[in-house]
Swiss-Prot record:
GO terms for biological process: tRNA modification. It catalyses: L-aspartate(89)-[ribosomal protein uS12]-hydrogen + (sulfur carrier)-SH + AH2 + 2 S-adenosyl-L-methionine = 3-methylsulfanyl-L-aspartate(89)-[ribosomal protein uS12]-hydrogen + (sulfur carrier)-H + 5'-deoxyadenosine + L-methionine + A + S-adenosyl-L-homocysteine + 2 H(+). This is Ribosomal protein uS12 methylthiotransferase RimO. The gene is rimO. InterPro entries: Elp3/MiaA/NifB-like_rSAM, Methylthiotransferase, Methylthiotransferase_CS, Methylthiotransferase_N, Methylthiotransferase_N_sf, NA-bd_OB-fold, Ribosomal_uS12_MeSTrfase_RimO, rSAM. Its cofactor is [4Fe-4S] cluster. The lineage of its organism: Bacteria, Pseudomonadati, Pseudomonadota, Gammaproteobacteria, Lysobacterales. It comes from Stenotrophomonas maltophilia (strain R551-3).
Length: 453
C-alpha cells in the first residue's frame, strides 16, 4: 500500500466482544484507505479500544492510553471504559475523543477529524455532510420516521409505518457535520417530533463525552451546543413540549414552535382523533409567551371536516381571536384514500368548505398583520437567503423557509452582505406577510455568539 496513505495505530483490549468491535473498526478503516501500523511512532493517530469490566482491566486500559499518549500524543479512546469519560479525561485530558462500546461511527468521526482520509478523485465525490437540495446555509435534520398516531384524516402511518427514532448521537453527529459544512440553520423535522425517543424508551447515547437521552429536550440541549439556529417543526401538542420552551427563553434554540392544532372544537378534534382539551391549549400558548415572550407559534388547521357545523366553525374563529397565533396554514378538508375520516357522516359541501376557508384566512390575516406591525421599530436578527441587486431577502427567527414570511433588506447596496450571513435589521415597514427594513452597519451590530441567539 502507498506510503502516502494515512496511518492508524490500534490497541485492542478486553473480551471477544470487544475484539469483534475492533475488527469492525479496523475493517472500516481499511475500506477507507487507512494503513494499520504496528508501532506508535509510525502512526499518525492511535485508537485504543478499552475494557472496564474489573479494576485490573481499568488499570490496563489506562496504562495503554498513557503509553500511547507518551509515545504518540494523538489518541482516540473507545470501548467499555469510554462509558466513564470523566475518569479518562481526568487522567489524560488531551485525548482527542472518547466513546463507548460498539460506537463505531463515533470512532470513525474522530479519526476523520484528526486524520482525514486520502482524497480519491474517482470515488470521493460526496462531501461528508452529504448531498443537499437546500441552499448551503440551511438544512433539514430528520430525527425519526413514521408515526404512532391514528389521526382519522391521515394515512402517514400506513405509508411510513410506526415511529422509528434515530439514535440521538447519530442525529447530533449529522448536525455537527452539517454545521461544519457551512449550515447556519438546522430545521428539525419528522412526522411527530415531540414523540422522539418513545419507541426506544429514551435510550441514552454519548456525544462529546456527555450522555444524552433520545428525547426531545435532550436533543435540543445537544443541538444548542452547535453554532447554528435550531428550529422545531411538526411538534405534536404533547404536555412535555413545554419542557423545551425554557431553552427558547435562554436563546439556546430558536423561539419557534410549528405545532399543528388542526381544530378548536372538542367534538371535531375527537372525530379527528386529536387532543381535544382546547382550554388547556390556550393556557399553554399563554404560558409559553410568559416564559419566552418572543416565541413564534405557527400552526395548521383543517376547515370543513366531516360533520363540522357552523357553530363549531365559529369556535375555531374564536380560538384564533384568543390564541393570536403568529403564523397559520389552513386547508379545506379533502378525502384521502385510505383515511378513516372518509367514512364519517355529514360531509360538508365543497362550497361551504371554501367559504369557511376564506373567512378563516381573512381573520388570521388580520391577526398576523397586526403582530407583524408590532415589530416596526424593533431590531431583528436575520439570516440572509438571497441578494437581488440592491435588495436582500432574509428571514428572522420567526420565519421558517418556504412557509413563513420574509424580511426585505432595502439598503443591501449600502451594507456588505453575504448569503448565509446573520445581520441585524431595523424594521421600518410591514404588510400582511413580510417585514421591511434596513441592515445595521457591521460596526453597529452586537457581537454575534451563535450559541446565544
Amino acid at each position: 500500500m502507498s506510503q502516502l496513505n494515512p496511518k492508524v495505530g490500534f490497541v485492542s483490549l478486553g473480551c471477544p466482544k470487544a475484539l469483534v468491535d475492533s475488527e469492525r473498526i479496523l475493517t472500516q478503516l481499511r475500506s477507507e484507505g487507512y494503513d494499520i501500523v504496528p508501532s506508535y511512532d509510525s502512526a499518525d493517530v492511535v485508537v485504543v479500544n478499552t475494557c472496564g469490566f474489573i479494576d485490573s482491566a481499568v488499570t490496563e486500559s489506562l496504562d495503554a492510553i498513557g503509553e500511547a499518549m507518551n509515545q504518540n500524543g494523538k489518541v482516540i479512546v473507545t470501548g467499555c471504559l469510554g462509558k466513564r469519560p470523566e475518569q479518562i479525561r481526568e487522567a489524560y485530558p488531551n485525548v482527542l475523543a472518547v466513546s463507548g462500546p460498539q460506537d463505531y461511527q463515533s470512532v470513525m468521526e474522530a479519526v476523520h477529524e484528526a486524520l482525514p482520509p486520502k482524497h480519491d478523485p474517482f470515488v470521493d465525490l460526496v462531501p461528508d455532510y452529504g448531498i443537499k437540495l437546500t441552499p448551503r446555509h440551511y438544512a433539514y435534520l430528520k430525527i425519526s420516521e413514521g408515526c404512532n398516531h391514528k389521526c382519522s384524516f391521515c394515512i402517514i402511518p400506513s405509508m411510513r409505518g410506526k415511529l422509528v427514532s434515530r439514535p440521538v448521537d447519530e442525529v447530533l453527529r449529522e448536525a455537527e457535520r452539517l454545521v461544519r459544512g457551512g449550515v447556519r440553520e438546522l430545521l428539525v423535522v419528522s412526522q411527530d417530533t415531540s414523540a422522539y425517543g418513545v419507541d426506544v424508551k429514551y435510550a441514552e447515547k454519548m456525544w462529546r463525552d456527555k450522555a444524552y437521552q433520545t428525547r426531545l429536550k435532550a436533543l435540543c440541549e445537544g443541538l444548542s451546543e452547535l453554532d447554528a439556529w435550531v428550529r422545531m417543526h411538526y411538534v405534536y401538542p404533547y404536555p412535555h413540549v413545554d419542557e423545551v420552551v425554557p431553552l427558547m427563553a435562554e436563546n439556546r434554540i430558536l423561539p419557534y414552535l410549528d405545532i399543528p392544532f388542526q381544530h378548536a372544537s372538542p367534538r371535531i378534534l375527537r372525530l379527528m382523533k386529536r387532543p381535544g382539551a382546547v382550554e388547556k391549549t390556550l393556557e399553554r400558548v399563554q404560558n409559553w409567551r410568559r416564559i419566552a415572550p418572543d416565541i413564534t407559534v405557527r400552526s395548521t388547521f383543517i376547515v370543513g371536516f366531516p360533520g363540522e357545523t357552523e357553530a363549531e366553525f365559529e369556535e375555531l374563529l374564536s380560538f384564533l381571536d384568543e390564541a393570536q397565533l403568529d403564523r397559520v396554514g389552513a386547508f379545506a378538508y379533502s378525502p384521502v384514500e385510505g383515511a378513516t375520516a372518509n367514512d364519517l357522516p355529514d360531509a360538508v359541501p365543497e362550497e361551504v368548505k371554501q367559504e369557511r376557508l376564506a373567512r378563516f384566512m381573512e381573520k388570521q390575516a388580520q391577526i398576523s398583520a397586526a403582530r407583524l406591525e408590532a415589530k416596526i421599530g424593533t431590531v431583528q436578527q436575520c439570516l440572509v437567503d438571497a441578494i437581488e441587486g440592491d435588495i436582500a431577502v432574509a428571514r428572522s427567527k420567526a420565519d421558517a423557509p418556504e412557509i413563513d414570511g420574509l424580511v426585505h433588506i432595502q439598503n443591501a447596496d449600502q451594507v456588505a452582505l453575504r448569503v448565509g450571513e446573520f445581520v441585524d435589521v431595523e424594521i421600518t415597514e410591514s404588510d400582511d406577510h413580510d417585514l421591511y427594513g434596513d441592515a445595521l452597519p457591521a460596526a453597529a451590530r452586537p457581537a454575534l455568539d451563535l450559541k446565544v441567539l
